[in-house]
Amino acid sequence: MISPFLVLAIGTCLTNSLVPEKEKDPKYWRDQAQQTLKNALRLQKLNTNVVKNVIMFLGDGMGVSTVTAARILKGQLHHNPGEETRLEMDKFPYVALSKTYNTNAQVPDSAGTATAYLCGVKANEGTVGVSAATQRTQCNTTQGNEVTSILRWAKDSGKSVGIVTTTRVNHATPSAAYAHSADRDWYSDNEMPPEALSQGCKDIAYQLMHNVRDIEVIMGGGRKYMFPKNRTDVEYEMDEKARGTRLDGLNLVDIWKSFKPRHKHSHYVWNRTELLTLDPYGVDYLLGLFEPGDMQYELNRNSTTDPSLSEMVEIAIKILSKNPKGFFLLVEGGRIDHGHHEGKAKQALHEAVEMDQAIGRAGAMTSVEDTLTIVTADHSHVFTFGGYTPRGNSIFGLAPMVSDTDKKPFTSILYGNGPGYKVVGGERENVSMVDYAHNNYQAQSAVPLRHETHGGEDVAVFAKGPMAHLLHGVHEQNYIPHVMAYAACIGANLDHCASASSAGGPSPGPLFLLLALPSLGILF
């Protein structure tokens, strides 16, 4: 048994030794604060240029506690204490909070939230691209209740559009950009009930290829949902679970190819080598399906077959940026959510760090003068870290104390519920007896569940670029796409555009903006 006094003594020594010398000088903190103040004062001159490009980064399940833990991890991966590190999203000048509830759920799911931040209306949990008049699983409540997304609005305005995700391309988040479904789980017709099929509802993979036929870039997982039932997967030939699922016998990849104009350059790729061999500036349409289901966790990724999120984002921007009218790109770090559901904090946080790297890559390829970039989450998780850990403590390490009840150590990271609930001999498992630094270690939880749940608290919204100042304070989640549309002069937000101009030219003044906003029904 570890002595609590020994743990406390070690923690005290570590705390003293890990304080950087410069931080002991008050001048360091005063100078830092003064520089931050100067940066804030510069924001008084608002950037009201008309947006050419819109990039939305969605960290699925990336609540504020995940953002903070990812920040520390990023720093520690660079051999720093971690707490002082800045994520790319930390550098964005405008921050707001988003209220994530669904119309019928206090703690939301990823489908109803995706409908909110992509389509501009709140919806029921489990439904995508439809209003709250649609009931989950009830196909006959879909017709007439469809709502369109910012991706559709951008495409209708002449912009190029793209979707990049680390989940299936027909998963909850991306599907709200193009599909209208009473159930997020209708990935292919194989997952649909006979009643829904007989009533004429289409699966989400089918809708991906048919609803918005000219999406320029689609990258992620989900290969098996595009091919006929039992068709062998190109990569996992012996894996029955990787085989095609479609009961209708359709080859949606071939259908995707058939919809593309002959004079355009269209490419379907299924591995990283094929992707990186392409000249993106010579590609008009790209479909990349790199796994039968979701893509692998970043820590498990096969660098030969699976591209990283950063690589996919870079290629997507190169393809989309050829359009002089600009583009809309949705990027999802989707497996942050999966890591948390499995109680595998290390997997989740490495996914978040990789998404932050992709944010940096996108920032280096675009300009704040004409590109609005938004980073947010659909919901949070019951994930936390604490325990009075000293500065520089490994984010996956032990707290510097033991429980004053069972006298056992505990990791700083814990979950409110989930699969990490472990009882050994009638008592809480002693974490010092297991490898709590393992990639797949499941952090302890207070309540036993097979899958950890979402959290219901607000999530952060980070914004930079033209009109980013419209994201401030606390907003309903469905407000977000209205800001993007207003800034880019697309969709229904066109009244102010005649006197507005593109980046670098004269812009509508603050008074004009204040007069224009009420017509959009926007409340602050």
From Swiss-Prot:
The modification Phosphoserine is found at residue 110. Its cofactor is Mg(2+); Zn(2+); Ca(2+). Phosphatase activity is specifically inhibited by 5-((5-chloro-2-methoxyphenyl)sulfonamido)nicotinamide (SBI-425). Ca(2+) binds at residues 235, 290-291, 306. Zn(2+) 2 binds at residues 337, 341, 454. Its EC number is 3.1.3.1, 3.9.1.1. InterPro entries: Alkaline_phosphatase, Alkaline_phosphatase_AS, Alkaline_phosphatase_core_sf. This is Alkaline phosphatase, tissue-nonspecific isozyme. Alkaline phosphatase that metabolizes various phosphate compounds and plays a key role in skeletal mineralization and adaptive thermogenesis. Has broad substrate specificity and can hydrolyze a considerable variety of compounds: however, only a few substrates, such as diphosphate (inorganic pyrophosphate; PPi), pyridoxal 5'-phosphate (PLP) and N-phosphocreatine are natural substrates. A lipid is attached at residue 499 (GPI-anchor amidated serine). N-glycosylated. GO terms for molecular function: ADP phosphatase activity; alkaline phosphatase activity; ATP hydrolysis activity; calcium ion binding; inorganic diphosphate phosphatase activity; phosphoamidase activity; phosphoethanolamine phosphatase activity; pyridoxal phosphatase activity. It catalyses: a phosphate monoester + H2O = an alcohol + phosphate; diphosphate + H2O = 2 phosphate + H(+); pyridoxal 5'-phosphate + H2O = pyridoxal + phosphate; phosphoethanolamine + H2O = ethanolamine + phosphate. Homodimer. Belongs to the alkaline phosphatase family. The lineage of its organism: Eukaryota, Metazoa, Chordata, Craniata, Vertebrata. The active site is at 110 (phosphoserine intermediate). Binds 1 Mg(2+) ion. Zn(2+) 1 binds at residues 60, 110, 378-379. SMART domains: alkPPc (SM00098). Disulfide bonds join 139-201, 489-497. It comes from Felis catus (Cat). CDD domains: ALP. Glycans are attached at residues 140, 230, 271, 302, 430. Keywords: Biomineralization, Calcium, Cell membrane, Disulfide bond, Glycoprotein, GPI-anchor, Hydrolase, Lipoprotein, Magnesium, Membrane, Metal-binding, Mitochondrion, Phosphoprotein, Signal, Zinc.
